[in-house]
Swiss-Prot record:
It is a multi-pass membrane protein. It holds the Pfam family Neur_chan_LBD. The record marks 92, 94, 99 as: Confers toxin resistance. It is found in: Postsynaptic cell membrane; Cell membrane. It comes from Natrix tessellata. GO terms for cellular component: postsynaptic membrane. Glycans are attached at residues 46, 94. InterPro entries: Neur_chan_lig-bd, Neur_chan_lig-bd_sf, Neur_channel, Neurotransmitter_ion_chnl_CS. Belongs to the ligand-gated ion channel (TC 1.A.9) family. Acetylcholine receptor (TC 1.A.9.1) subfamily. Alpha-1/CHRNA1 sub-subfamily. This is Acetylcholine receptor subunit alpha. Residues 1-127 are extracellular.
Amino acid sequence: ADGIFAIDQFTKVLLNYTGHITWNPPAIFKSYCEIIVTYFPFDEQNCSMKLGTRTYDGTVVAIYPEGPRPDLSNYMQSGEWALKDYRGFWHSVNYSCCLDTPYLDITYHFILLRLPLYFIVNVIIPC
C-alpha cells in the first residue's frame, strides 16, 4: 500500500446475526518479487503475498480465505506477464514469544509466465 497504512476514509462493516463481522477496507496492495532470470525470456516466476495481522492474535481476530483461489475480478492483464496459476493458503503460526497464541495469515502464491514476444522481436532477432 505504498507505505501509507492509514485508511483515511470511513468504511462500513457487515454485521451478521451470529456476531460475525466483515470489514473490507479500501486498499491497493503492491508487492515485489525476486526475479530469477536463468531462462529469460522464457521464464516463470513464483511470487507470494502474505496478509495477516500482528496487532491482534488468532484468539481475537479470525481471518480465512473465501476459497482456495483469490478473487481476480479486478485483475488487469499485462502484455509482459500471464497469470499461470494462483492459490491462497491459510496458516496458523505459534511464535516462540507466545507459544500458546496462534497468529493467522493467508499467503497467496502467484505463478507468472513471461510473454516473450516483445523480447524475441526487439532483442533476440536483431542480434
